[in-house]
């Protein structure tokens, strides 16, 4: 069964959503992060909560550590955190604070030797966030181009004990227009590492279609704030 991971994105300790990762598209969510934690925690079908420090992702260092540490105390659900994680000490600090999994993006993509070291040090607890426009990978809060192809890059990661690869189609993110099913399905076939889909998810039908592609988990952003998404789920 595909896992459901509702998302909380933070700017200045406020729960927000962006469209296509553009910081000038910031939209404050109706629920605070604390309220979202409580809301998501009531559902047995929620396997973990996905938290991102958006300013950390852009500024290249974690900005919301203390606030995220306070959120950790509000739920027994697993929590994964990403955004600005660039060092082993940051990862260890998050784990010491009770965070279950850490997400690395830019650092892991630009330094695969470091990524391998972290994954072997914390097997199954490190997730790599791979964000792309089409097949072109972006880094540093989605603001910097790379010359890396999504599939070529992911294929070289097969021997690394990552918890999974979080794939975000930037063009879909925040739009609730549906995930990029085609590229997501191709990515699942290109790697033995579990693939987590993020970006554009609207409703349970999208989840069911992702499940049919053997996607391991789905990260739900804006849709998770709508009661209609959770109808019939426990």
UniProtKB/Swiss-Prot annotation:
UniProt pathway: Amino-acid biosynthesis; L-histidine biosynthesis; L-histidine from 5-phospho-alpha-D-ribose 1-diphosphate: step 4/9
Gene3D superfamilies per the UniProt record, alphabetical: Aldolase class I
Subcellular location field: Cytoplasm
GO CC aspect terms: cytoplasm
UniProt keyword annotation of Isomerase present: yes
Gene Ontology MF: a single term: 1-(5-phosphoribosyl)-5-[(5-phosphoribosylamino)methylideneamino]imidazole-4-carboxamide isomerase activity
Enzyme class per UniProt: isomerase
Keywords (A to Z) from UniProt: Amino-acid biosynthesis, Cytoplasm, Histidine biosynthesis, Isomerase
Catalysed reactions listed for this entry: 1-(5-phospho-beta-D-ribosyl)-5-[(5-phospho-beta-D-ribosylamino)methylideneamino]imidazole-4-carboxamide = 5-[(5-phospho-1-deoxy-D-ribulos-1-ylimino)methylamino]-1-(5-phospho-beta-D-ribosyl)imidazole-4-carboxamide
CDD domains reported in the protein's UniProt record: HisA
One Pfam family matching this protein: His_biosynth
One Gene Ontology biological process: L-histidine biosynthetic process
Record: active site: 9, 131
Entry keyword annotation includes Zinc-finger: no
UniProt protein name: 1-(5-phosphoribosyl)-5-[(5-phosphoribosylamino)methylideneamino] imidazole-4-carboxamide isomerase
Gene that this sequence comes from: hisA
